């Protein structure tokens, strides 16, 4: 699906403009403390001309046939665009934590690392992560590495999403 830059795009958001829109697809997840799984996911990036994007994502567990089994994670926040491809990401999650991420974007790639994590009393232990988003052949590929439940930083989620 072709993508056109919006007329009111803030100049600082140029390096991440390719993310704008709705994306959907399937991914895989694994971690030492859980059984491997497949999931469906939808990501939405919107903007209003100011130097940030609003972000929302939801996921659901799927079976081997791709049929929805149950709802899974949701996250929402703001991707704040700074000069020279620097970005800040503020996220809140339905699982009881909030994060501050810092990173850089260039050449169809966005790399982020957590700077701070805040958890509610009932949230599982989670200490940080790394995210990599890439524009590959017009699709959105991403990988998410996580440190949680006493485990060191390691791969947790990866997916290929297409523009909807």
UniProtKB/Swiss-Prot annotation:
Coiled-coil annotated residue ranges, if any: none
Keywords, alphabetical: Heme, Iron, Isomerase, Metal-binding
EC number(s) per entry: 5.99.-.-
Entry keyword annotation includes Zinc-finger: no
Cofactor note: Binds 1 heme b group per subunit, that coordinates a highly solvent-exposed Fe(III) atom.
Pfam families per record: THAP4_heme-bd
Keyword match Protease: no
UniProt cofactor(s): heme b
Entry-linked InterPro entries: Calycin, Nb(III)_bact/plant, Nitrobindin, THAP4-like_heme-bd
Highest taxon above the source species: Bacteria
Catalytic reaction list: peroxynitrite = nitrate
Residue positions binding heme b: 130, 156
Example of a GO MF term: heme binding
Pathway of action: Nitrogen metabolism
Domain notes: Forms a 10-stranded antiparallel beta-barrel structure able to accommodate a hydrophobic ligand in its interior. In fact, this fold hosts the heme group, which is located in a wide surface cleft.
Subunit structure: Homodimer.
Family: Belongs to the nitrobindin family.
Function: Heme-binding protein able to scavenge peroxynitrite and to protect free L-tyrosine against peroxynitrite-mediated nitration, by acting as a peroxynitrite isomerase that converts peroxynitrite to nitrate. Therefore, this protein likely plays a role in peroxynitrite sensing and in the detoxification of reactive nitrogen and oxygen species (RNS and ROS, respectively). Is able to bind nitric oxide (NO) in vitro, but may act as a sensor of peroxynitrite levels in vivo.
Protein name: Peroxynitrite isomerase
Organism phylogeny: Bacteria, Bacillati, Actinomycetota, Actinomycetes, Propionibacteriales
């Amino acid at each position: 699906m072709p993508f056109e830059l919006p007329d009111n795009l803030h100049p600082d958001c140029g390096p991440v403009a390719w993310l704008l829109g709705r994306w959907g697809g399937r991914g895989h997840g694994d971690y030492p403390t859980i059984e491997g799984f497949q999931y469906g996911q939808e990501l939405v990036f919107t903007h209003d001309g100011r130097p940030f994007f609003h972000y929302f994502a939801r996921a659901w567990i799927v079976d081997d046939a791709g049929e929805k089994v149950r709802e899974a994670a949701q996250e929402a926040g703001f991707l704040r665009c700074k000069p020279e491809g620097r970005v800040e990401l503020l996220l809140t999650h339905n699982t009881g934590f909030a994060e501050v991420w810092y990173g850089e974007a260039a050449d169809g790639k966005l790399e982020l690392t957590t700077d701070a994590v805040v958890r509610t009393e009932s949230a599982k232990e989670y200490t940080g992560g790394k995210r990599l988003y890439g524009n590959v052949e017009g699709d959105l590929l991403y990988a998410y590495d996580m440190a949680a439940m006493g485990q060191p930083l390691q791969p947790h989620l990866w997916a290929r999403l297409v523009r909807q």
